[in-house]
Amino acid sequence: MIDKPINRCPMEQNTEKFSIPNSQFSILTSYFPDLTDRQKEQYAALYDLYTDWNAKINVISRKDIENLYPHHVLHSLGITDMLRFKPGSSVMDLGTGGGFPGIPLAILFPETHFHLVDSIGKKIKVGQAVAEAIGLENVSFRHCRGEEEKQLFDFVVSRAVMPLADLVKIVRKNIKKEQINALPNGLICLKGGELAHEILPFRNQAISMDLKDHFKEEFFETKKVVYVPL
């Protein structure tokens, strides 16, 4: 079990040393033009790190690794369409896999703590190694099932892990009562396809937003971000 902060690891301010395709990185910076040099450095490092780790432990479809930034990093940041976390917030990423959406969000919100949870230990190993390599100081990891995690958080985020009703059952226990953000504490998840039936039990509470309204790439045509207050 891994349940500890990541050690600091300083990085040089030079994105040119990474083999990231320029077209991919320009997609990211076009939507997030206010990134600091530090954040650009951290995002740029993800390409080589995930390419290397993915050859050993499959956390991203090997056919899709070339689309790391639009399909995984930018998609993770689609959470910001619903909410930008205030400093001091705490967020659990349930079913993080190799670190999505938690690691891209942790880079963007350095004053928010992200706790990344997954039931598959080797995937947690990848996420931890990536976080250590880029010097993320605001993340912790735990190898466990969501039902086993008892800590409290302002929000839980998730990316296409399971049906909405199942997610709500698991994470309701993890939501703090005290609120500091613009939205009441709850669940924010990234979903795809037709969600009318899935959202039906929460129709009086849930908010669903189409990512295609913010991101112009074809990949986002059917992608949504869904919020349920808990």
Curated annotation (Swiss-Prot):
- Chief localisation class: cytoplasm
E.C. numbers: 2.1.1.-
Cellular component GO terms, alphabetical: cytosol
The protein's GO terms of the molecular function aspect are: rRNA (guanine-N7-)-methyltransferase activity
InterPro entries according to UniProt: rRNA_ssu_MeTfrase_G, SAM-dependent_MTases_sf
Task: List the signal peptide residues.
Answer: none
Q: Which top EC class is named for this enzyme in its record?
A: transferase
The record's listing under SUPFAM superfamilies reads: S-adenosyl-L-methionine-dependent methyltransferases
> Keywords on this record?
Cytoplasm, Methyltransferase, rRNA processing, S-adenosyl-L-methionine, Transferase
Asked if Isomerase is a keyword of the record, the answer is no
- Cellular location(s): Cytoplasm
Record flagged with keyword rRNA processing: yes
Binding positions for S-adenosyl-L-methionine per the UniProt entry? 95, 100, 146-147, 159
Annotated function? Specifically methylates the N7 position of a guanine in 16S rRNA.
Q: Which family does it belong to?
A: Belongs to the methyltransferase superfamily. RNA methyltransferase RsmG family.
What NCBIfam families would the database entry show? rsmG_gidB
Matches recorded under PANTHER family: S-ADENOSYL-L-METHIONINE-DEPENDENT METHYLTRANSFERASES SUPERFAMILY PROTEIN
The protein here is known as Ribosomal RNA small subunit methyltransferase G
Q: Which organism is it from?
A: Parabacteroides distasonis (strain ATCC 8503 / DSM 20701 / CIP 104284 / JCM 5825 / NCTC 11152)
